[in-house]
């Protein structure tokens, strides 16, 4: 019995051992099969990743460490901890990273594809154009710009702080910069002043004195790195937050001031040519100034008026153009317009009174670290002639003048500009084809303003004209001065305000009536208003009128005893409350409540103010025909 029990016990142990062996063998076989599958998959993945083609025979050299990594096996690579550059979820210690919000999708710019309709076709005006590229004329229908010009909204024209072209940007809607923190809503009664000389006129008697029409100063707070390479005086380089005022004057000199104190920041530049227009700075922050003279030089040699590109590193002239251009039709070489620069294509856009539009590929080479700048210009010219434009061989009373004295507005790839002969033209800058023309009746000197309105950001232009004696009426009479809102897509008039009939004084003391100063478009609490200075409404009087953008009706108007050739400047306080600054022939600068037209303050500057002010925060800079430049603080 005992033997039988021992035998059963031994048999039971043997069965358990055999079962254990079977189970172990089973698991070993399973593990071997799985490992084989994993190894095969791993090799296939590695081979495909190395060659990009599993069937490729090409031998790929492995980077250092890759062979060792492969030896670690598929699981090691599969579960290897990734760094944040690989997946953006964990840092190199394996800790979760904070989730970054996605970049917002940029809002696409509204399309702008202008075209003509009945009454705005260029052919209705007998418009003819020609193009010259690098000195050779070409078929106007064959021209296409090598680099596409495409401007954005006016407020994106530059990242610089200040007012760097006439009325600030390509919409011509920003003659002031920053915020005017006013408590008293008054002019400070202790302005700084600087005396400017004069220059004998080339033709006739008298002299060009002080600052004339349009005469706006340029205001800029240069980046500190740019100041360091300029020929500024040491104290100016060291003054933190310096606001530099740059003023091209009719004395033939370009002056540089501290806008807060009137102290000269550097030596003036002498050119021997009188400047009426504002000039312009480069929107990219390059130390370049673009400026053209308003008359021929009476100095020794009696040189012809033209335009300059000046280095503001050392005051040297880098390039001159427009002098007795053989491509011109009209004999004048004056430049009262204020230029614009397309930053992306490095293109200077400069209209002239000769009737030529200059598009200059600058090929700028600026090395701030080395303190050097150079240009290698490539010039394209466009000119026009309409059926009613006269030429040098036709008396002025028998035909309207060629040429552009106002400053161009640009939106996307199209420029809108008026001329001396009663045309408002929309020009495609990439093909130099005229898209539409609107009749402005007379010699048009004012610079309009471009706005985008409504939910669809539809573009409009506000524009008016002047009264040139003997074209529409004799100089002893008056002529209508309409104010228009114009659809920038088609050139059609949206509304017309016909409130004004103006006079003009003939030569030798010619004073043109109508709108000579430029429009101001309200923003913030003035958003629905447009401001227009009208001259010679009754004798030497004039008005500043605020019109509703929607329909052209009058919101308010104020009558001056002296006409306003100067342009209105809106300024805004920290709450968006808007005020209007307006200067006049009587020598006064006025401050108005922009919504109501209430006169808040005025100051006598001593002589005729044809020039337009520019404002940086609380600091106004303005010049007079009497030869003084003023720096006035709003308080």
Per-range role (PLM):
Residues 1-20:
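N-terminal Lys/Arg-rich, disordered targeting/topogenic segments
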Residues 24-39:
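Hydrophobic membrane-insertion alpha-helices, especially the h-region
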Residues 44-120, 124:
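N-terminal, intrinsically disordered, polar/charged segments of Gram-positive cell-envelope systems
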Residues 101-152, 173-213, 218-291, 295-335, ...:
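Extracytoplasmic/lumenal domain signature
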Residues 170:
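Conserved oxyanion/phosphate-binding beta-strand-loop segments in alpha/beta enzyme cores
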